[in-house]
């Protein structure tokens, strides 16, 4: 694994050889490496984060060869593609974050070989009206379709935009008061409800087993929430800035709580945990249970209520 932004801004770096022990390259790893012209990427690499090679001569050269830059079945970049109608090749298995950010295309056809679409992949493609999304896609990153004509049209059909049982986006203007996610939804994508500032309550069905990062970030009027059993992690900044949040119910299936999940949740007073104190203490909470760490300070200082009434 090469972690996020590991070499970002290394302006004198000219060449990189990645060994075949590497499977994952994080986001913005080589961002701003303005002299990086040669990169050897082995076939072992199966995941590449958004903007991994942005602002490098290597990417610029690849874009000149083909505006759809594909490595190991991963579509890294299509921002320079000038076609109004884009058909992604059948050998692509995933689309990187920011891959088409701010592209002027009007339509895109995604083949059924694709299983995942990264964060902001089509964000700010204002002219994008038609998208063909196959059933094979089982993962959407954060804010994949933000500020596209396509998602605006979907709002007219339903303020909750659901694709392949994944809730990917919502119309902030229509989601007010209590919002109910329909049964059958299995995942809430990252950023799906971010800054939904008229929503005070939300009902999440038991069918949901994953909630993406930043999912409820900045929902300033959200007062309480119950996470269903089956969700195993609460990822980065999920409830960041939920100023009105006073209580949350957490199932015993949760084993991990990420960075700044409850940052600025200053009114969080009660946490209802479905397990035992021992199970609670076994949860990997970023920053630990220390009140000296601001990441999840408001979580660890709230009253924890356990299933046995203690």
Place the predicted regions along the sequence by residue.
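A structural signal for leucine-rich repeat
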Residues: 263, 284-287
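Consensus positions within tandem repeat domains that build extended binding/scaffold surfaces
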Residues: 3-6, 26-31, 49-52, 97-99, ...
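Extracellular/surface-exposed low-complexity segments
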Residues: 287-310
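Structural signature of tandem-repeat unit edges
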Residues: 1, 10-24, 33-47, 56-72, ...
């Amino acid at each position: 694994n090469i972690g996020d932004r590991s070499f970002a801004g290394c302006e004198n770096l000219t060449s990189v050889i990645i060994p075949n022990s590497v499977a994952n390259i994080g986001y913005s790893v080589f961002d701003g490496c303005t002299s990086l012209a040669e990169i050897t990427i082995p076939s072992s690499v199966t995941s590449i984060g958004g903007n991994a090679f942005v602002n490098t001569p290597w990417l610029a050269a690849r874009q000149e060869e083909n505006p759809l830059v594909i490595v190991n079945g991963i579509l890294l970049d299509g921002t320079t593609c000038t076609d109004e109608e884009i058909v992604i090749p059948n050998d692509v298995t995933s689309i990187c974050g920011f891959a088409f950010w701010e592209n002027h295309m009007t339509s895109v056809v995604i083949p059924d070989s694709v299983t995942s679409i990264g964060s902001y992949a089509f964000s700010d493609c204002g002219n994008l009206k038609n998208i063909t999304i196959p059933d094979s896609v089982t993962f959407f990153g954060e804010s994949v379709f933000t500020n596209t004509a396509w998602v605006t049209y979907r709002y007219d059909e339903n303020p909750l935009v659901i694709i392949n049982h994944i809730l990917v986006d919502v119309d902030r203007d229509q989601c007010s008061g209590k919002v109910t996610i329909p049964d059958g939804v299995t995942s809430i994508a990252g950023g799906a409800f971010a800054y939904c500032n008229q929503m005070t309550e939300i009902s999440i069905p038991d069918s949901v087993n994953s909630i993406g990062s930043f999912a409820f970030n900045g929902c300033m009027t959200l007062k309480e929430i119950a996470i269903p059993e089956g969700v195993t992690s609460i990822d980065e900044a999920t409830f960041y800035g939920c100023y009105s949040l006073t209580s949350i119910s957490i199932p015993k299936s949760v084993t991990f709580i990420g960075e700044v999940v409850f940052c600025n949740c200053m009114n969080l007073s009660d946490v209802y945990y479905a397990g035992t104190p021992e199970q609670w203490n076994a949860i990997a909470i970023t920053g630990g249970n220390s009140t000296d760490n601001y990441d999840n300070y408001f979580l660890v200082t709230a009253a924890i209520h356990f299933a046995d009434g203690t």
